[in-house]
Amino acid sequence: MTTEDYKKLAPYNIRRSSISGTEEEEVPFTPDEQKRRSQAALGVLRKTAPREHSYVLSAAKKTTSSPTQELQSPFLAKRVDVVDEDVLPEKNQEPPALARPDSGLSSSTTEKIAHRQITPPTAELHLVAPDLEALSTPDSCEENNAAPKIIKEIPGTLQDGQSDPTVASQQLADLSILEPLGSPSGAEQQIKAEDCTNMLMSPSSCMVTVTVSDTSEQSQLCVPGVSSKVDSSSTIKGILFVKEYMNTSEVSSGKPVSSHCDSPSSIEDSLDLAKKPPHEGTPSERPTEGVCTYCSHEIQDCPKITLEHLGICCHEYCFKCGICNKPMGDLLDQIFIHRDTIHCGKCYEKLF
């Protein structure tokens, strides 16, 4: 209520009273004064009510909408990021200065640029296609021709069996230095070289990439003995099998690597050798399962006790102390092993 509104009501607030001694008696208002008083009060309410109502609504909106605004703020930021990523392919066509951002750029923008440049490997693989080579400029044609060289060197290292990531990374670095870095396609080729060095760490992904580029060449390099009728899926499986079990077959049999790549049957034989469980072996190395060590009878479905490091596999009722021959099948928590010999509690105490 402002001062002007109060002045309008002031004449009606003064009540007429007759002072008789110390007591004051209130005189009731006349109907005319009561009507004027009510009209003035209604006029003031009409002026102040919308303003006070809007103030209350604004305060209520602040209290109720503040938590929702805090929840919606990261959602708005995510939408802005999606819009920026749609524009980023145009930024990739700029010189490779984006790979070295200025100090003024924030960390979030640098992460977006780096992520966008590395993520699409499929777009870079399409550069090798002859259709795009015909549409590109002569400079880009030279750089696109350099890309298959990088990809073709990867199966060469795998064919020799060396697969040294440091040597391959040095070769890729030499090729990337020869390429011009000023053109936009040069930046993509540099990123492509980095992707190839990263793929060398995982042989399976490297194999799949080479298969996409040139399947016939891969079958000639890595699996020379396989016929041309074998489909691409079986070729990939054969390559992975040879790569995985090559070292184990060389150590166990001492045969050269080429002997294991002669035919698919030799690959399956090497797989069967590698898939054998480790506990299987010759009778001299490990005890024959199914025959009791003490009574030399078959164990079959009876409860058995097996101690592999001692060469014991026996019935539960045949298990006994190695000194006093006391049955120890029900006393497994009281056995002691000293110098590869089973002792009961009493025999073990006699040692000290």
UniProtKB/Swiss-Prot annotation:
Species lineage: Eukaryota, Metazoa, Chordata, Craniata, Vertebrata
Intrachain S-S bonds: none
UniProt-annotated location(s): Cytoplasm, Cytoskeleton; Cell junction, Focal adhesion
Positions bearing Phosphoserine: 18
Composition skew (Polar residues), residue ranges: 61-72, 251-268
Keywords, ordered alphabetically: Cell junction, Cytoplasm, Cytoskeleton, LIM domain, Metal-binding, Phosphoprotein, Zinc
Gene3D superfamilies, sorted: Cysteine Rich Protein
Protein name: Zinc finger protein 185
Biological role: May be involved in the regulation of cellular proliferation and/or differentiation.
Bias type Basic and acidic residues, positions: 272-287
MF GO annotations: metal ion binding
CDD domains noted in UniProt: LIM (cd08368)
PANTHER family: ZINC FINGER PROTEIN 185, ZNF185
Region of interest: Disordered: 1-73, 86-121, 251-287
Keyword NAD attributed: no
GN (gene name): Znf185
PTM annotation (Phosphothreonine): residues: 137
Tissue-specificity statement: Expressed in skin, kidney, ovary, testis. Also expressed in brain, cartilage, heart, lung, spleen and thymus.
SMART domains given in the database record: LIM
InterPro entries: Cell_Prolif/Cornif_Regul, Znf_LIM
Tagged with keyword Transferase: no
Organism: Mus musculus (Mouse)
A single cellular component GO annotation: cytoplasm
Domain LIM zinc-binding: 292-347
